[in-house]
Design a protein with these regions (language model features):
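Short, small/polar-rich loop/turn modules that mediate ligand/substrate recognition or access, typified
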Residues: 174, 179, 249-251
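Conserved glycine-rich cofactor-binding loop
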Residues: 9, 16-17
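Alpha-helical segment proximal to the catalytic Tyr-Lys
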Residues: 127, 171-172, 247
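Active-site helix of classical SDR
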Residues: 122, 158, 166
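Substrate-binding pocket helix/loop in short-chain dehydrogenase/reductase
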Residues: 98-99, 106-111, 219
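Residue(s) in the substrate-gating loop at a strand-loop-helix junction
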Residues: 142
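Short C-terminal tail/terminal secondary-structure segment
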Residues: 147, 238-239, 245, 250-265
Length: 265
């Protein structure tokens, strides 16, 4: 299937590893010109080369050194790239921490990174999309936005907030060819996740396989997949939603969580 992304310009935040890198790679493979961002120049350039190679060197991949978790970094990106067709807000952090140990600074930090980074970019780029009557904005939320994990309540709050923002922005696109949607991955095999699962294991020094099995048995027992999701599985859905072919999908929260959420709506 041709996703009709050739000639489209896509910005993916949090794109030097994991889900973001997979999304950027998939979009580039479909012919989109891709913009990525990161704080560390070496890692940023490695990601750029990887994406460029995967596309067969057929598309432009622009790497902008900017910390999109900050307002200053957002301005750097906007100054470097004035207009885009597709915005994928993927930047995010997570940490397992008891509710009773969470300080005000913990709540604010995760909110500023997970929520405000996407709001800043959408606030700028959505204007141009509406003026040109085409655009796609996608928030990479999480199943945690619906099923708040007790070990990461602050994280769950930010993912619920993303769903609210995305739906609210979709309401502003009425009668246009601009859409705003959310994608909800489940636990995904990305950078740092294996260490995270091992840190939650009941016995010391478990193998990655043991930690993964225990995590799904104890903490995500409702998952039908019963394994970590591959980032490319999330990227495939995201690429379709970024495509002109998805024009009837707007204001939706689309799941790629392996059947973890036990509801049909």
């Amino acid at each position: 299937m041709d996703l009709q992304l050739k000639g489209k310009k896509a910005l993916v935040s949090g794109s030097t590893a994991g889900i973001g890198l997979a999304i950027a790679t998939t979009l580039a493979s479909e012919g989109a010109a891709v913009i990525i961002a990161g704080r560390g120049n070496e890692k940023l350039q490695r990601a750029r080369e990887s994406i460029q190679s995967a596309s067969g060197n057929k598309v432009d991949v622009v790497a902008v050194a900017a910390d999109l978790a900050t307002a200053e970094g957002g301005e750097t990106m906007i100054n470097a790239v004035a207009d885009i067709d597709i915005l994928v807000n993927n930047l995010g952090i997570y940490e397992a921490k008891s509710f009773f140990d969470l300080q005000d600074s913990d709540w604010m930090s995760v909110f500023l990174i997970n929520v405000m980074s996407g709001i800043r970019l959408a606030r700028h780029y959505m204007r141009g999309m509406l003026e040109r009557n085409f655009g796609r904005i996608i928030f990479i939320s999480s199943e945690s936005g619906i099923m708040t994990p007790p070990e990461m309540i602050h994280y769950g709050l930010t993912k619920s907030a993303q769903l609210a923002v995305a739906r609210g922005l979709a309401e502003l696109t009425r009668g246009t060819n601009v859409t705003v949607n959310s994608v909800l991955p489940g636990p995904t095999r990305s950078e740092g996740v294996v260490d995270f699962l091992q840190s939650m294991a009941s016995k010391p020094d478990p193998t990655p396989e043991e930690a993964e099995k225990e995590f799904f048995q104890k903490h995500r027992s409702s998952s039908l997949l019963q394994r970590l999701i591959d980032p490319r599985e999330v990227a495939n859905l995201t690429a379709f939603i970024a495509s002109p072919l998805s024009s009837a999908t707007n204001g939706a929260a689309l799941r790629a969580e392996g059947g973890l959420i036990r509801s049909i709506y």
